[in-house]
């Protein structure tokens, strides 16, 4: 049993690492792709846009159907489609086919990422659910600081197309591994009607994630530009700063599991939001303080992603019969928050400058805390009236 659990965690971790690499590796490759297809950088940016929009739309569907039909088969399907889409990206004869390939990739990842979270929540022991989730989440976050640089290195020696070939081959191997790993996991057989109230409650719950994403990505999307503008950082210093952030995110996810299992999902998810708001104020005050910026970015990511992981565990605990659709909507909420955060960041920069970004993020963290606390009160009221369930 212990051995099977380790295998499941490893397969989940490496699968999410691949999904994260596919997400994070595209942006650094856009200049090379733009040059090869002779299109503007703005046009190549649509590779990212169509991926995220497709993911956000498709993820709730796969979450809903996996709650009824089982998750393993859809994860396997997603990985096969992932392999096909990345092969198509690698060998696209035109820019139109390249865009189509990224739409298919977004559809594939929508069938994989949220369902991995959900199936880990299904099989994890109740007293270890936070730890198990934190481990697989760290796979996705490791791609932030390891997967993308490895891909960029491959581009240097073999060209950008080679990266997608490698991901296509890896996806095929993981399709086999995931099929064998999850084929014994029983279907959840959820029969609840989400239309009558439950879906609205789920959307209300994942709105916390949307505001959390705003508190993280309003600054992170423009971090490199902010460090250059405010601190005159070199490319190497910016890369070092992003590495500190990425390592903090991975460690935050991992330690979150231990604290969540010990103190509970609600306490940790709320405490991290308050702490993050304070850290962001400090980040704003000391953004141009030299080497302190590395430490503050590390702590910000550590606390922020500890909160994200604990809140995922909280959602899984609160919606045991709808884990697939909850994780899917939570991931959709995350992408919506990233999009809104980037828009808010652009507005703040154009009106007040980069130095105001940390304070806007801090305000978003406070709003997320208020929503999270309100969610706790609603849960307590529901527990007091079990007949309504």
Sequence positions of predicted segments:
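Paired small-residue
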Residues: 81, 85-88, 96-105, 291-299
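Extracytoplasmic gate region of multi-pass secondary transporters
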Residues: 203-243
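Cytoplasmic helix-loop-helix junction between adjacent transmembrane helices
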Residues: 95, 101-139
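Helix-loop-helix hairpin linking two adjacent transmembrane segments in secondary transporters
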Residues: 97, 126-180, 222
